[in-house]
Amino acid sequence: MIELAPDQLPPLARWFAAGAPGPAALAEHVPASGTGSWWADRAHAPRALAVACAGQVLLRGDPSALAPDALAVFDAHYVQAPTCFLPALRSAFDRIVPWERMLYVHQLPVAAPCPPRGVTVRRLVPGDAPALAALAPDAAWLHASWGGPAGLAASGLGWAAFQEDEVLAVACTYFRGSAYEDIACHTDPAHRRRRLALACVTALCQDIAGRGHTPSWTCSRDNRPSRLLAWVAGFRLVHEYVHYLTGQPARCGAVPGSPAAHPAAAVRPGDTKASPGGTPRWRGRDSVR
């Protein structure tokens, strides 16, 4: 596939439904935020279209229009696509691993828990970028959809629990759509089980509702802590789906110019890739315990 410039994009309404919850909001988030990239089988009158951001990909169109290795640019990504794309994915990579996912929508208002003494929950501001950057490296996925710590801090769409200048927990809009905002949260492992994530998520949900939008939440079926937090925060299950973690290109080696070559795709907001032994581990948007 070839990468499209913003002025080369076809009308998106026929490709992606507007106002959809969960990862479908990615297609609206990319043009609004300026992060991510668009790909097609050809620039003029494309038959297959992909949008990628922060290690996630949405595929639409006619897979028969793709060359056998056309999707190899999306190695080490989480791909959501109609089942008709599975043969094309299998031919492009040495393996694809299905992940069962659960999509929740916020339905019940929840009272915010009182933060512990010395902890303040507030909206992120541009000056908080250094504090976000100081989070552990395995939390870098949190701001990938905003192009980095500065992008998330300046977006005005994140809430964090602070102890002095240290970020203990963060909840933020990950993909912002026209009706739904798919959210993510992370708590420093040393500060889990203090209800900090719940405090941040509750504040974020109130903020999103104030914009006239609805929060959504996605996580792995196997991640009970994430599912429990979603339930306690007032989210309810509305849909289950599968996305696919891609392996290495079938022809081996990273594809030059692929999204995986960029820092934003270095960590992925899903369950994480399979470990070297082949056993998947939790990580990314599920690291909310």
What are these regions (language model features)?
Residues 180, 185-199, 222:
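Conserved glycine-rich acetyl-CoA-binding loop
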Residues 1-23, 109-146, 257, 271:
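Short amphipathic alpha-helix that is part of the acyltransferase structural core
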Residues 21-34, 138-162:
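Active-site rim helix/loop that mediates acceptor-substrate recognition in acyltransferases
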Residues 74-83, 208-220:
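Conserved GNAT acetyl-CoA-binding A-motif
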